Amino acid sequence: MRCLPVFVILLLLIASAPSVDARPKTKDDVPLASFHGNAERTLLNILRDGDNCCIDKQGCCPWG
């Protein structure tokens, strides 16, 4: 029963500790939000272009 307060205090200290990256950042590192934004923009461009080309020509879309 005496260990419970010590355990709770340790959990609080661990949760409030600042996070540290395991490896240093390089110039090639891209934030994940930027990656998701680029992927979404690319997908929207493919879908937008696909709407125009698939009306007249069969097989011109990226997905067949």
Swiss-Prot record:
**What protein name does the entry list?**
Conotoxin VnMRCL-04
- Tell me the leader sequence span: 1-22
Tissue localization of expression: Expressed by the venom duct.
Task: Say which species the protein is native to.
Answer: Conus ventricosus
Q: Which UniProt keywords apply?
A: Amidation, Disulfide bond, Neurotoxin, Secreted, Signal, Toxin
- What modifications follow translation? Contains 2 disulfide bonds that can be either 'C1-C3, C2-C4' or 'C1-C4, C2-C3', since these disulfide connectivities have been observed for conotoxins with cysteine framework V (for examples, see AC P0DQQ7 and AC P81755).
Domains (record comment): The cysteine framework is V (CC-CC).
Kindly report the protein's main subcellular placement as a broad class: secreted
Q: Does the keyword Disulfide bond apply?
A: yes
Tryptophan amide, modified sites: W63
Q: Does the keyword Thylakoid apply?
A: no
Q: From the Swiss-Prot or TrEMBL record, state where the protein is found.
A: Secreted
CC annotations in GO: extracellular region
Q: Which family does it belong to?
A: Belongs to the conotoxin T superfamily.
Output the Gene Ontology terms for molecular function: toxin activity
Query: Which ranges are cleaved off as propeptide?
Result: 23-48
Kindly give the Pfam families that the UniProt entry links to this protein.
Answer: Chi-conotoxin
